[in-house]
Amino acid sequence: MLVLARRTNESIMIGDDIEIVIVDIKGDQVKIGVKAPRNVSVHRAEVYKDIQEENRKAAETKIKPEDLGKIGDILKKKDSGKKG
């Protein structure tokens, strides 16, 4: 792990297009800003772990393609029963 010291308003570059800026430092809390292209996902570590866990659970779901068709039929019947 690379460890760098930075002060408020100083930054770190990752590659050519990701910039990490130290926005504020108060006590033991550091606020950072991340400038990155829209196609780069940026998450806090605890949120990222939750996303990974949900993706893992979704990948393990054992839904068969024919079951998806049945769900579609049920939704169509439900929608056709609505009054507009």
Swiss-Prot record:
Per the record, its GO cellular-component terms are: cytosol
InterPro entries according to UniProt: CsrA, CsrA_sf
Short name of one Pfam family: CsrA
Q: Which UniProt keywords apply?
A: Bacterial flagellum biogenesis, Cytoplasm, Repressor, RNA-binding, Translation regulation
* MF (Gene Ontology): mRNA 5'-UTR binding
Q: What's one GO BP annotation on this UniProt entry?
A: mRNA catabolic process
Q: Which family does the record assign?
A: Belongs to the CsrA/RsmA family.
Q: What does this protein do?
A: A translational regulator that binds mRNA to regulate translation initiation and/or mRNA stability. Usually binds in the 5'-UTR at or near the Shine-Dalgarno sequence preventing ribosome-binding, thus repressing translation. Its main target seems to be the major flagellin gene, while its function is anatagonized by FliW.
List the PANTHER family.
CARBON STORAGE REGULATOR
Q: What is the protein's quaternary organization? A: Homodimer; the beta-strands of each monomer intercalate to form a hydrophobic core, while the alpha-helices form wings that extend away from the core.
Protein name according to UniProt: Translational regulator CsrA
